[in-house]
Amino acid sequence: MRKTFIYVASALLAASGLSSCTNLDETLYDQVASGNYYNTKEDVIRAVLRPFEHGYWSIQSRQVLNEETADQLITPTREDWWDDGGRWARLHRHKWLTTNGEAQSEYNGCFQGIMQANLVIEDLEKRSARQFGFSEAEFNNLKAQNRVLRAWFYLRLLDAFRNVPLAVSYYDTSKNSEGQVEPQKVYDFIETELKEAIPELSKKTSLGGNQNLEGEWTQAGAAALLVRLYLNSKTYIGRERFNDCEKVAQDILDGKYGVYKVADRWDAAFDWNNETCDEVIFAFPGAPGYSHWHYSADMYMWTVPAKSNEWLHDKKNKAGGHNIKYSCSPSFNSDGTPYHFELGMPIARFKDYPSDVRLKKYRNLGNSQREGMFVYGKIQYTDDEG
């Protein structure tokens, strides 16, 4: 009897062992997947905002790619500083190499953001507002914001590369193009997404800055992307749409998409407290100790000459000293002979309009006020040692 019991028990163990080998479902204890991530309202908000953080980070490659290849700025070599194997000179002369990396950074950064937005959009489409305590309008707004963010990434790709793949799904890659599509298809996708998203987005209802809408895509933000799309339509798809561009821009000014106001100073949008500026339609928020670290070099350390922190009384940058990377492209040769370029030479062109207040030498006036836009000549400063 005892032997029979042992045999039966052994057979049961063997059978259960065989059956368990075919069940490979995992219970995750040390990881979070989309299936078990969305539990609270705060989880949804965190997921929705993740692609925004990536978008903020990704702008730096765009800024370098656009500015260094244009005519108004250069990165000149200063003795052995800023040569970097001719990297910046190649960008300015439009002779860059695949090893430069700026174009690849822009391409990869945008598509990473697109796939992050695709993930969030599809995850929210599988869930309901009631499940997390949202109203339908709130839930639809969150989805629409990621659609606009995705369109913003595609607008950058269209501007930089024209022919790019069109990826609209994270989970079902059969919905994505197998390769590049023509610019018209990307253009149409951007326009459709923005138009469909606008009614689902929030609208700014009063003056005094974006307030609780800071860093969110609103109706005016999406409309402003349409303005940019239409403004460059001739370049993108060979068809002018200036009338459409003018209409949407005027609608923004007239308050159709929210309450905004053109500032009475040219530099108001760049004040330290620009979150109160009603000219700002969309901006990624940043603050010391929060999301700002990505720009500590190109925004702070490399935009003004060494020792400028003493001259400007700049205490905000605690990441390192200044070492200027950018300069205005020159208007004169080293012997004082003027250049005769068709483009560039911003200083000489500003001097054609002596009443332009931006031509003054930059000076920090305190209380978030300044004058001028250029730094030139010798800088007088007093450091901590007098």
PLM region spans:
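Short, surface-exposed recognition loops and adjoining beta-strand edges that mediate ligand/DNA contacts
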Residues: 35, 61-81, 167-170, 202-221, ...
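Conserved, well-structured interaction surfaces
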Residues: 45-49, 53-58, 81-161, 177-188, ...
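Acidic, glycine-rich segments characteristic of secretory precursors and extracytoplasmic regions
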Residues: 8, 21-80, 92, 184
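Sec-dependent bacterial lipoprotein signal peptides
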Residues: 1-19
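Extracellular structured ligand-interaction cores
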Residues: 141, 148, 163, 217-219, ...
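Short, well-structured active-site flanking segments
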Residues: 24-27, 158-169, 239-242
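TPR/Sel1-like alpha-solenoid repeat signature
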Residues: 223-226
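Elongated scaffold/linker segments in the mid-to-C-terminal portions of large proteins
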Residues: 42, 48, 85-109, 258-386
